[in-house]
Amino acid sequence: MKSIKVFPIFALLLVAALSIAACSPKAAPDQPASTPNEQPAEQPTENPFNQTALGECYNPFNPIMEGKVWKYAMVSNKVSSTLEVSYKDVTPSSFTTVQQFPDIRTEVQWTCGPDGMLSSQFASMSIAQIPDVQFETMEVKGVLIPKEDKWQVGYTWDTGYVIKVKFTSGETVFEGQGNMTVTNTISAIEPITVPSGSYSEAFRVDIAGNMMMSIMGTESTIPLTYTTWYVKDVGMVKNASADPTISYSMELVSLE
């Protein structure tokens, strides 16, 4: 059935919208992943963004800098692709993340509060394969990026979303609801090497949970098990999953 074909693609888009899994439904031709640069990465000599001006949106583990672009290389099922992340409309209490995939552009509004950063809605997307995607956030729980003082080994926090969704495939309009819950744990501080360079202290966050979707009578529960590495004053440098349902790796290539 058509809905069965659309569902796996849509599930991946939801994960990408949360910035936790990056799989473009129409990726670039198969090519080997970028070879990591063995040279040490340049470490910031001073804070690259203004703490006073950013207010509650200041967080060195997810630095918000307008005019900068984080470029990532992605590999999913041996297929390579790219992602560029930038920020706009930055205020002391909110900002917008712009994610540019080869065939998808998303914009996600975030809010900042005393507990950390939270994307208060799913992305408004421009998708060639699935036009007119509409998300309505029904409920949000927890934060995605906790405050700086919480970044210690052993710290755990939960994130959850309940959403309604509507999109078009061909001449068919699909409607459904999703429930996504994950538990995040800072498990270690360890060295890591990615295409952008080598970092001696990367905070490894292990994430586990489930995404339950019901679209036009088709129901599915997708287990989410992946790991993200953050470097202070750089942000996310790697995000990866070995789960056969959503298998991918995303690594920072440059920050320009």
Where are these regions (language model features)?
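C-terminal motif of bacterial Sec signal peptides marking the signal peptidase cleavage site
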Residues: 18-22
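Bacterial signal peptide processing site
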Residues: 24-26
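Bacterial N-terminal signal peptides that target proteins for export
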Residues: 1-10
